[in-house]
Amino acid sequence: MTSKTKRNIVVIGMGYVGIPAAALLADMPGHTVVGVQRRSSRSGWKIDWINAGKNPFEGDEPGMDELMARVVLDKKAFHVTDDYAVCQDADVILIDVQTPTDTNRIPQYVSLREVSARAGKYLRPGVLVVIESTVAPGTTQNIVQPILEKESGLQAGADFFLAFSYERVMPGKLLEYITDFPRVVGGIDEESTRRAVELYRTIVRKEITATSVLAAELAKTMENAYRDVNIAFSNEMARVCESMGVDVYEIRRLMNARPDRNMHLPGAGVGGHCLPKDSWLLKFGVDTYGKFQVPARMIALAREINDEMPLHLVDLTVQALAERGVVLDGAKVAVLGVAYLEDSDDTRNTPATAVIDALQHKGASVVAHDPYVRDLDGYELTRDLDVALQGADAAVIVTRHRLYYDLDLARLKGIMRAPVLVDGRNVFDAEAVRSAGFTYRAIGKG
């Protein structure tokens, strides 16, 4: 992981992908990196924060504090601006913006189109552009490439180079998943691929596989669709186990004793930027650019099953309260954890919002708690656990933050109005909770 080539690198989009990628690249000799970030009301604070050498992630991110201080303050190799004019001096431009889907499951490329156009205005001959945002298969060549060519007056493959290389980052392991995971790189032509591989070799320790741009796009969306389908199986089996009166985690242990089996963990729902929408990106790609239509029934059903899990958690809450003679309408419910992933501050597509919405729709008063999340737009959120739990009729665990494993059940029972605990992430041992005097319900535990 060394660089003998001097590169001016621009990374557009300072989020969970762009920031660690930019910082790692800036840590390599010969690299100078500029991040581009909008000064929006939601994310504009990151500009000054990063330029002060601070890690903007509130979750546990090993190595990030030290890396940010080193590349910003010591090496002065990384800073952030909102001015796209920095693209005119770039040798490499990475695009790391969100690519959500709308309520009709159609990709919304407003940000991708905008940044492609703005970067394209400053594009010079010889520049390498890499799309790291997850996109529907066919997007790089059918949407991004024409925009770059139109705005720059240059031709991809002849005047500038274009590739797609998807991220595999996960909050809590942002740096590790970039440096120590295999990388897939696909360019629109051989030279684009070669240059992109050369770039990533400066920061990736594992194997880098070169392929076509379309194959790389398909690999990313299929990889996440595969995981989503496996999680859906586990979630459905969890409900089967509830019906049969057994513990799904015991069944999982028995199944996974066979070396070629890997039943995933069930839970309160699937979140994050990728899994809830990448199956739809895959389907959109084949629907739009494929030679013929493919129903893609399995991935659609998996999405439906996983989307039902937050509502199932609410049903378990209703059942547990009823056992105590409490109705949900008018009850106070503490929702514990709003990040989609444990010990992170990432709330993108978090199942917690679906849980809260369903509870409130049924008349509950909800206070959410999370030790890492700053705010959750439109929802009452506190970092004070006692505020959430004081006088609560039920505590519902949505995220398995380490903090919740250490909850003092006796103290919890003392401050809650009704000792009801609903576990969406297998945080507690059922027997221990019930022995402490709680009514307990959990996903997958009959």
Task: Please state what every model-predicted region is.
Residues 1-446:
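Structural/interface elements that position substrates and couple domains in central-metabolism enzymes
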